[in-house]
């Protein structure tokens, strides 16, 4: 950041490789102390970290590398926790919607979701418990970010409720559930769920016996099956 005095700390931080999921929190939001309630108890060196985020000169300058590193780590944590609150506001949601539409968070790897854009989500609101995941609003599942540079971002910096708040505010943006579902088949026939039930806890020999029994129970040629499933569930 020292190479350009005109770039704010927030812009610099969000521009770092691996921080592409973050949006830039408005400084006015950060300057409102009500929005920061309780964070001073969660973040070490809170005052110095806040001054760094807002590009303010610290009251007491400790010129040593160790202290600077600690303040930078605290600033990252503080900004992340502020960010989790900010993206639940109308302004924050609008910024994240733009990033979502630009596919900044990637698309769902599930084939039948047809490249549905995903949203970042935390599995915990407590810092240090879980890394950020990606939520697909179409199949309603979560995935590990594809790029390794995003796999070390704390999930609490996005929170557990962000995607759901976005769709409460913009219900028109919620995609429809996939029309097509994958259907497992064997030799062209659909596999009935019952076919897997008898295999649990059986050894290879028992499985072979089950197959033999199933073959003996199949309908002889020339007779009507009456629409019943055989032991394979086909």
From Swiss-Prot:
Pfam family membership, one: CK_II_beta
Alphabetical UniProt keywords: Behavior, Cell projection, Cilium, Phosphoprotein, Wnt signaling pathway
PTM comment, free text: Phosphorylated by alpha subunit.
Keyword presence, Phosphoprotein: yes
Expression by tissue: Expressed in a subset of the adult male sensory neurons: CEM head neurons, ray RnB neurons, and hook HOB tail neurons.
GO molecular function, one term: protein kinase regulator activity
Stored InterPro entries: Casein_kin_II_reg-sub_N (IPR016149), Casein_kinase_II_beta-like (IPR035991), Casein_kinase_II_reg-sub (IPR000704)
A GO BP annotation: response to hermaphrodite contact
Coiled coil, from the record: none
A single cellular component GO annotation: non-motile cilium
UniProt-annotated location(s): Cell projection, Axon; Cell projection, Cilium; Cell projection, Dendrite; Perikaryon
Principal cellular location given in the protein's record: other
Modified residues (Phosphoserine): 2
Function of the molecule: Participates in Wnt signaling. Plays a complex role in regulating the basal catalytic activity of the alpha subunit. Modulates two aspects of male mating behavior; response to hermaphrodite contact and vulval location, acting in the same pathway as lov-1 and pkd-2.
UniProt similarity note: Belongs to the casein kinase 2 subunit beta family.
Subunit structure: Tetramer of two alpha and two beta subunits. Interacts (via C-terminus) with lov-1 (via PLAT domain).
Identification of the protein by name: Casein kinase II subunit beta
Gene name per UniProt: kin-10
